[in-house]
Amino acid sequence: MMPGAPSPSAPSIALNDENTMPVLGMGVAGLSDDETERAVSAALEIGCRLIDTAAAYGNEAAVGRALAASGIPRAELFVTTKVATADHGFTASREACKASLDRLGLDYVDLYLIHWPAPAVGKYVDAFGGLIQARGEGFTRSIGVSNFTEEHVSNVIDLTFVTPAVNQVELHPLLNQDELRKANAQHNVVTQSYTPLALGQLADNPTVTSIAGEYGKTPTQVLLRWNLQLGNAVIFGSSNAEHIVTNLDVFEFELASQHMDAINGLNDGTRLREDPMTFAGV
């Protein structure tokens, strides 16, 4: 373990299927194979145990190589991947899960998500049926969705009679997803945030930097802590080992209510990723 690194493993959050998931982990979107292997290896050495990938990222095999090389027992790891829109459908989504397992070199993943609802395609409910089948066959421990609106989540529950364990969505102070978080909570669905650092757009924000100064923390740590204190699970992206150490070191302080409120006040609905209502998916 690197000097000064936090102790292994973030706290865990309970899912609605009796499984648990670390509240904080690292994603590998946009990373090349080499970058992925280095980042995942560094994250695991530092103590991170949740790694988030997707078929659409094209780097599942690189994640698998880093996992295998780590020597960490499989039971201590939490691996998430996602089905691409091209594989929406009952049979196709189940088969896509098996293909992801082959690329990852794993017998199962801990969480399998529908990457995008792609409502214009109209197959996300069928795709979730395939995820239910994959879970039943032991290909994945938990199943969930990503980028789903309240309407999409409700449709899945109403039509399959199964509630997703997780809804992973873009969530940061500029887009705090208050209504969606409440809706997820009503369904006992964990909200998991991605793009929590708003692509660096808040690194120099006066509100954030001022609060960071009061706690002796970095703006990044404050943004991650804010997200966690909302009750969310969080996925950050980084290929820098030093940044990964800093990002994981957010459990030894707590933001006061006035500072939470100040950061909440930055919400203006700015979406930095695609709109789930119109995006055709990946």
From Swiss-Prot:
Q: Name one GO molecular function term.
A: aldo-keto reductase (NADPH) activity
Indicate the residues that form the catalytic site: 57 (proton donor)
One Pfam family, short name: Aldo_ket_red
Q: Which UniProt keywords apply?
A: NADP, Oxidoreductase
Q: Which taxonomic lineage is given here?
A: Bacteria, Bacillati, Actinomycetota, Actinomycetes, Mycobacteriales
Tell me its family: Belongs to the aldo/keto reductase family.
Is NADP found in the keyword set? yes
What is the name of this protein? Aldo-keto reductase MUL_1987
Annotated NADPH binding sites:
197, 235, 238, 246-247, 273
For this protein, the Enzyme Commission number is 1.1.1.-
